[in-house]
Amino acid sequence: MRRGFDALLLALPLAAAAAPPCDKPLYLSFDTGHMGVAPLVAEVLARQQVKATFFLANERTLSGGSSLDDQWAPWWKARAAEGHAFGSHTWDHDSWLADVGTAVRVKPSQGPQAGQVRTLDAAGYCAELQRPAQRFEAMTGQKMQALFRAPGGKTSPALLAAARSCGWSHVGWTPAGFLGDELPSERHSNAQLLQRALRDIRAGDILLAHLGIWSRRDAWAPAVLEPLIAGLKQRGFCFATLRDHPQFAAVPTR
């Protein structure tokens, strides 16, 4: 018994050395997109042993379907099983335009009303937030934390109040965390974006990228993603999901 206890004591420092405390955390996040790079993103994250947070909207894909349809359900289920975190990006990718009293005027880029301006009261906006969570649970068997990212990061007092009324908390990104994958590659090359990110990112930053951008000619992922993660690790950074962010850790699931 004593020998076994001594062996356990010897093993404890080794275990601690294998997983040092993370004192320079970064929070990598992805919004849905055309999903063309999604399998490659998943491969990089697995290879680098990085957990990220995904914000889900039902967006049109390269294959002609949508990012939350049955074709993609196994992909989302696999990411959930790997321990990534998830939030809502509104079902129809509703971009805020204006407050109308306590309601909000938005323009969806997806769904049957894509491109049409519509006004949503608090209940209507809550339904837009909740639909991705419901679909996520149907696909994965897991509940989503009540975190959301408004498309384009555009919020307002009425929009945030509507979200709070049904228990949702907004997550933006930090200035240096804007990784630039939606910028035109003719003016913002992958090499430039990588160099800027490695230069500017600081501990605690929330990083933003997408699972495919229609307008960018030279895809940002995985060309920038893997060297970015590797370079940040070399600088002493580590990665965590927004479940572990001090501002959002207490947010419940929906």
Walk through the language-model features, giving the residues of each.
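Sec-dependent signal peptide recognition
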Residues: 1-11
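N-terminal signal peptide c-region/cleavage motif recognized by signal peptidases
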Residues: 11-18
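C-terminal domain-boundary segment and adjacent tail
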Residues: 19-20, 52, 62, 217-254
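Active-site beta->alpha N-cap acidic-glycine motif
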Residues: 19-104, 109-113, 117-120, 124, ...
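Active-site-proximal beta-strand/loop segments in catalytic clefts of secreted hydrolases
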Residues: 30-33, 55-59, 89-93, 150-153, ...
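Histidine/acidic-residue-rich catalytic or RNA/ligand-binding cores of hydrolases
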Residues: 98-105, 182-187, 217-223, 251-254
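His/Asp/Glu-enriched short active-site or ligand-binding loop at hydrolase and phosphoryl-transfer sites
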Residues: 154, 159-200, 236-248
